[in-house]
């Protein structure tokens, strides 16, 4: 199951995000996620297996011009993460699908994904 995160989920997201992003402390992530959620430009989606959070995605709205798009705002996938032991099971695809649907519900026509 993938669910759209709420403010009560900030610590859960930070505990996953610290495994992906280079930060000094988990509190730094908690503060950033809290600030993002307060602006309402960010959406987070959490993948659960049974009751264990195993992955997440963060989407932001961008209002500046984004090459290749013809609308504003544009959804921007800031990051997607799945715990190593849960990879290769289609969970990232499931999280991405939920993120895309979350952007559609906000009338956002484009979701920008930059991957490496």
Regions from the PLM with identified roles:
Residues 1-13:
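A short beta-loop-alpha structural element at the N-terminal edge
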Residues 14-28:
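Helix-loop element at the rim of GNAT/NAT acetyltransferase active sites that forms part
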Residues 25-48, 58:
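Active-site rim helix/loop that mediates acceptor-substrate recognition in acyltransferases
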Residues 46, 52-61, 76, 81:
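Conserved beta-strand in the GNAT
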Residues 64-77, 87, 109:
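A conserved beta-turn-beta hairpin within the catalytic core of GNAT-like acetyltransferases
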Residues 86-98:
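Conserved acetyl-CoA pyrophosphate-binding loop and the N-cap/start of the following alpha-helix
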Residues 96, 103-115:
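Conserved GNAT acetyl-CoA-binding A-motif
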């Amino acid at each position: 199951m993938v669910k759209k995160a709420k403010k009560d989920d900030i610590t859960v997201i930070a505990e996953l995000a610290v495994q992906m992003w280079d930060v000094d402390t988990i509190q730094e992530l908690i503060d950033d996620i809290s600030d993002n959620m307060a602006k309402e430009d960010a959406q987070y989606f959490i993948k659960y297996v049974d009751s264990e959070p195993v992955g997440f995605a963060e989407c932001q709205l961008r209002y500046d011009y984004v090459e290749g798009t013809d609308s504003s705002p544009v959804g921007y996938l800031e990051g997607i993460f799945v715990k190593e032991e849960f990879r290769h099971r289609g969970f990232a695809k499931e999280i991405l699908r939920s993120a895309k649907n979350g952007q559609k519900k906000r009338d956002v026509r484009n979701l920008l994904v930059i991957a490496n």
